[in-house]
UniProtKB/Swiss-Prot annotation:
It catalyses: holo-[ACP] + malonyl-CoA = malonyl-[ACP] + CoA. It comes from Buchnera aphidicola subsp. Baizongia pistaciae (strain Bp). Disulfide bonds: none annotated. One of its GO terms (cellular component) is cytosol. Its EC number is 2.3.1.39. This is Malonyl CoA-acyl carrier protein transacylase. Belongs to the FabD family. InterPro entries: Ac_transferase_dom_sf, Acyl_transferase_dom, Acyl_Trfase/lysoPLipase, Mal-CoA-ACP_Trans/PKS_FabD, Malonyl_CoA-ACP_transAc, Malonyl_transacylase_ACP-bd. Coiled coil: none annotated.
């Protein structure tokens, strides 16, 4: 039996017509999770992904909840189809909430309320500011940190995510991010992509939001995860209720070190399964580790392929 880890994304490229393949959308377990989640959220999230005439899913307020619920629904179906347990679970950014739900550390209802509250606090932190997040392709972390220091942008612009050796996400005040983007381009960046994520996360602008969130987290019930969970920002195991609270609070202004965490665990883990409707983390992993197997459970073919390998 192979060791495997489950990966949970924090963001997905939401396309409402293709959020869930028929393999999932027609499944009773998946439908049940969406019904339960809709009760906690206060509106029909299943209907939203089927018909979104006002294009609400372009707003993080809605898309983050869809990402969470979709991943949990796919996980519940996965759990129903096999009897093995993951050796590890990891969430990228907001995906840590999903990882904690699936490892029975956090109730689904509490996760939904935390994500709604987290978004509210982050929006309040940006009340008089305009933010921006961009992905820099083709420059490494060291080069970008030198540019931030050279042009004195270290306080206005943060490294939000180190996804691979040569894919770095920047986050911060819009004009400052735009200026450092120009310097990155001159330094040899192959591509610079504006990310439609608002408010901007994993940057110093979110420190006030972090303090507010910590207060709420202190009044939220957590349990010790039944599967090992590693934080994608601190790279530490979440082995106590207090550690989880502190990690989730710090997360919104800290760097997601995806590149480091995957390199670290590849010594013991051969198979990486992304529990998602897309393949964002799977594609990142293929750039980080060449010899391990990465599969997204985003369609029937991949789901059945993964089941066959694991069983």
């Amino acid at each position: 039996m192979f060791k495997y880890t489950l990966l949970f994304p924090g963001q997905n490229d939401i396309n409402r017509k293709k959020i869930l393949s028929p393999f999932f959308s027609k499944n009773k377990i998946v439908q049940s999770i969406f019904r339960e989640s809709s009760e906690y959220i206060g509106y029909d999230i299943w209907k939203l992904i089927q018909d979104d005439p006002k294009k609400k899913l372009k707003n993080n307020k809605y898309s983050q909840l869809v990402t969470l619920v979709s991943s949990i629904a796919i996980y519940e179906l996965w759990k129903n189809k096999q009897c093995t347990h993951p050796n590890l679970v990891i969430g990228h950014s907001l995906g840590e909430y999903t990882a904690l739900v699936c490892s029975q550390s956090l109730k689904l209802s509490d996760a939904i309320q935390l994500i709604i509250t987290r978004y509210k606090f982050m929006m309040e932190a940006m009340s008089k500011k305009i933010g921006l997040m961009t992905a820099i392709i083709g420059l490494n972390e060291r080069t970008i940190r030198k540019l931030l220091k050279k042009y004195d942008y270290s306080h206005e612009v943060s490294i939000a995510c180190i996804n691979t050796d040569n894919q770095i996400v920047l986050s911060g005040e819009r004009n400052s991010v735009k200026h450092i983007n120009l310097h990155c381009k001159k330094a040899g960046a192959k591509n610079i992509i504006n990310l439609y994520i608002h408010p901007p996360s994993h940057c110093t602008l979110m420190k006030k939001a972090s303090k507010k969130l910590l207060y709420v987290l202190k009044h939220t019930t957590f349990k010790i995860p039944i599967y090992p969970v590693i934080s994608s920002t601190s790279l530490k195991f979440q082995n106590s209720e207090q550690a989880i609270r502190i990690s989730l609070a710090k997360q919104i202004y800290s760097t997601v070190r995806w590149n480091s965490i995957i390199k670290y665990i590849k010594k013991d883990i051969f198979i990486f399964l992304e529990v998602s409707t897309k393949s964002i983390l799977t594609n990142l992993n293929k750039n980080i580790i060449k010899k391990s197997l990465s599969i997204s459970l985003n369609c029937q073919a991949n789901f059945l392929k993964a089941l066959k390998i694991i069983l």
